């Protein structure tokens, strides 16, 4: 569901910008698709009232382990092209066992490339939505249903704090299923008065 794959993305962003010059535009991407000219044009359309979050989970030797099929050189060229035209870029780094040793190096690279921000993200992938319990690893799958990279949980300090609450929630509610049934869900898009387009094309 990467926005840059869609042939309508640039036209869509341009439409929003023409309709409302004060609207803040943003998107998340793995940055591996399209050419540098596409990214330069996106930066010009967005201007300073917008940003792109580039999901780079590691460096040249590790990013592809989670971002399957994504070419690192393309990621670097595309993000650099976006920044070169004044685009505001954020680097978001999901922490796994295989890349946790590269956080500081990636942070320095982001600074050198003039990213506006570098953020680490503690993933919630080490929780089984089927068994409703924590797990030590996450098996990656490709589009053909074949197993790919097995992702291992990072060190304790990099584990999503929400995963540590599992036992407390079970003790309080009896089960995770019951917790889901009685917990209120707050929509971030409503709270921030945003329009959010999902990978399936749903608009909220």
Residue spans for each PLM region:
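Short beta-strand->alpha-helix junction loop in the catalytic core
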Residues: 30-33, 59
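Conserved hydrophobic beta-strand within the GNAT/NAT acetyltransferase core sheet
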Residues: 25-29, 91-93
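Radical SAM enzyme [4Fe-4S]-AdoMet core and its adjacent flexible, acidic
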Residues: 10, 14, 19, 41-204
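His-Asp phosphorelay/catalytic-motif detector in bacterial-type signaling
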Residues: 21-23
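A short, conserved beta-strand element in the Rossmann-like catalytic core
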Residues: 3-4
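Short acidic active-site motifs
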Residues: 8, 37-38
């Amino acid at each position: 569901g990467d926005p840059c794959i869609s042939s309508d993305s640039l036209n869509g962003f341009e439409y929003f910008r023409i309709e409302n010059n004060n609207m803040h535009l943003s998107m998340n991407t793995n940055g591996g698709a399209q050419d540098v000219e596409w990214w330069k044009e996106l930066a010009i359309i967005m201007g300073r009232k917008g940003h792109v979050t580039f999901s780079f989970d590691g460096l040249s030797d590790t990013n592809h382990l989670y971002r399957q099929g994504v070419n690192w050189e393309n990621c670097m060229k595309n993000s650099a092209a976006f920044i070169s035209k004044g685009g505001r870029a954020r680097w978001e780094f999901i922490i796994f066992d295989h890349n946790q040793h590269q956080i500081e190096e990636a942070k320095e690279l982001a600074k050198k490339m003039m990213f506006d921000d570098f953020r680490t993200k503690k993933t919630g992938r080490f929780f089984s939505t089927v068994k409703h319990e924590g797990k030590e690893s996450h098996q990656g799958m490709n589009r053909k249903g074949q197993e790919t990279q097995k992702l291992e949980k990072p060190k304790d300090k990099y584990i999503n704090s929400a995963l540590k609450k599992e036992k407390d929630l079970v003790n309080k509610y009896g089960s995770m299923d019951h917790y889901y049934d009685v917990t209120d869900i707050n929509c971030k898009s409503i709270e921030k008065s945003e329009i959010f387009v999902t990978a399936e094309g749903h608009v909220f």
